[in-house]
Amino acid sequence: MSDNLWALARAFIITVVFMPFLIKFLKQSKEQAVIRKLGPDHQSKAGTPSMGGLLFVLAAAISAFIGGAAYHGMSGVVAMIIPVFALVAYAIIGGIDDALKLINHADDGFAFKPKLLAQTLSAVVIMLIMWLLGVPFTLYIPMIGTINLGLFYFVFLWFWLVGWSNATNLTDGLDGLLAGNSVVVYAAYTVIAMHMHNHIIVLFNFSIIGGLLGFLIFNRPKAKIFMGDTGSLALGAGLAIESILLGVPFSLIWFGLIFVIETLSVIIQTVGYHFWHKRIFPMAPIHHSFEKFGWSEWQIDLLFWIVSSILAVAGIFYMN
């Protein structure tokens, strides 16, 4: 357990120590978030730096590799490549998205097709690494069993990575909301990984949780910095790949139900407006609807965190 706590501490310390410097640098370079004018009044947040995910992702990656090398040798470093690559690759995609938004001073960054291409290429590389490391292309489906997908495994891998990275991206709309929920979901998978004796995923998760806890010090309401797409895409990709590596991908639908609800609210809102020219919710993603009802960011955060925690505890008891 001590090696895991050291992993958490390393990522936490790196994030807490260097985040003030990143905030100062981003403010001086005027790399600040562009706040959408639609929906709840968030214009008071204009000028808040974005791309905070850059630091906690980097801190988590460094801590994870150090932990893998220190306690498992070269085999630990090699095994850590898959989850860390997924985390970093999608952070880079999100970083490009954030950078383009800042350069263009607009809410739209990476165009849809280039962004999807980048996500697809990342999935190809991840699958290639998995093949080189001998990870079986099998999928466990509840009530059916384990099936060998062969090359069709790529389709599932791509869908899972793109789907969950975008789901967490949609959830990142309030100070502390995604970071707090991600801590809970990663903690749940840490318990699952411990039960499966998967020490690599445990180390990886402790590293991410450490980085996120450090980030929350600066991201809680009223946030001094946002994680941006750099962090939100990375967190979803990290959860997607580790659920696959643990052999329980569909459990993420339960543990990440908050992310699913957020995504469904956007889909339902879009379909409703397209076909009936009516909005089903006051605003989507659904966390903004709570704002419309007069809830504060802290109240919404706490509600979502509590729901995630209940789901996590129930899921852990069921799986164990």
From Swiss-Prot:
Keyword Protease on entry: no
EC annotation from Swiss-Prot or TrEMBL: 2.7.8.13
GO biological process, any: cell wall organization
Pfam family, one: MraY_sig1
Oxidoreductase recorded as keyword: no
Catalysis performed (reactions): UDP-N-acetyl-alpha-D-muramoyl-L-alanyl-gamma-D-glutamyl-L-lysyl-D-alanyl-D-alanine + di-trans,octa-cis-undecaprenyl phosphate = Mur2Ac(oyl-L-Ala-gamma-D-Glu-L-Lys-D-Ala-D-Ala)-di-trans,octa-cis-undecaprenyl diphosphate + UMP
Keywords attached to this entry: Cell cycle, Cell division, Cell membrane, Cell shape, Cell wall biogenesis/degradation, Magnesium, Membrane, Metal-binding, Peptidoglycan synthesis, Transferase, Transmembrane, Transmembrane helix
Annotated pathway: Cell wall biogenesis; peptidoglycan biosynthesis
Official protein name in the record: Phospho-N-acetylmuramoyl-pentapeptide-transferase
